[in-house]
């Protein structure tokens, strides 16, 4: 369980499934070397999504993992979290005055935040910041040829079902890494602009 500040104790982010584009398998997993994946709560293929109930017995905290060297959260250079337009569903385009589109196959991602201290009930109003490389393995704001872009980055706030959804592109693999997506969890959209992180972790998509 997470030790969270401000009375938001016991928030767990579960593995969600499926993240599937038109030509991608619909499965998500923890990064190599971490604990085995927990039960999938959401399956997404193309534009169709199904949700499976999670029992309290199956509910488990998500492991903390590195945010990597390209977070653009102000800890290593640029910070998109204080820019207008960062709260968005579609991550494929750059925003805040930048123009550009990420390369890669379409990908739909759904994440669900559950309260472990309340019988694994959904948490409304939690902010999730997600980022990843494009289909060519480039990180916006950091990689050569992409320093003037901020695609594949954005924040969503959980709905009444504890869910956030992103439309993006399938991240490319690069030496030593499976395709993967990083995320940070904050108590609210306002706290994402400088407040404490409740969780930093990532999902891997073995091809």
Task: Describe each region flagged by the PLM.
Residues 10-13, 27, 119:
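A generic signature of intrinsically disordered, low-complexity regions enriched in glycine/proline
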């Amino acid at each position: 369980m997470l030790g969270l500040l401000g009375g938001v104790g016991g928030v767990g982010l579960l593995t969600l499934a499926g993240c599937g584009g038109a030509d991608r398998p619909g499965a998500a997993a923890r990064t190599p070397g971490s604990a085995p994946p927990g039960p999938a709560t959401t399956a997404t293929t193309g534009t169709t999504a199904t949700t499976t109930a999670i029992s309290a017995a199956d509910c488990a905290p998500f492991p903390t993992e590195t945010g990597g060297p390209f977070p653009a959260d102000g800890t290593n250079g640029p910070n998109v979290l204080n820019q207008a337009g960062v709260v968005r569903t579609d991550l494929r385009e750059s925003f805040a005055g930048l123009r550009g589109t990420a390369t890669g196959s379409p990908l739909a991602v759904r994440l669900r935040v559950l309260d472990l201290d309340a019988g694994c009930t959904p948490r409304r109003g939690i902010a999730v910041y997600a980022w990843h490389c494009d289909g060519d393995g480039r990180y916006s704001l950091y990689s050569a040829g992409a320093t003037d872009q901020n695609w594949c980055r954005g924040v969503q706030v959980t709905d009444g079902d504890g869910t956030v959804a992103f439309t993006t592109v399938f991240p490319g693999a690069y030496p030593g890494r499976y395709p993967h997506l990083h995320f940070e969890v904050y108590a609210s959209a306002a706290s994402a602009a400088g407040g404490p992180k409740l969780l930093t972790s990532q999902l891997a998509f073995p091809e």
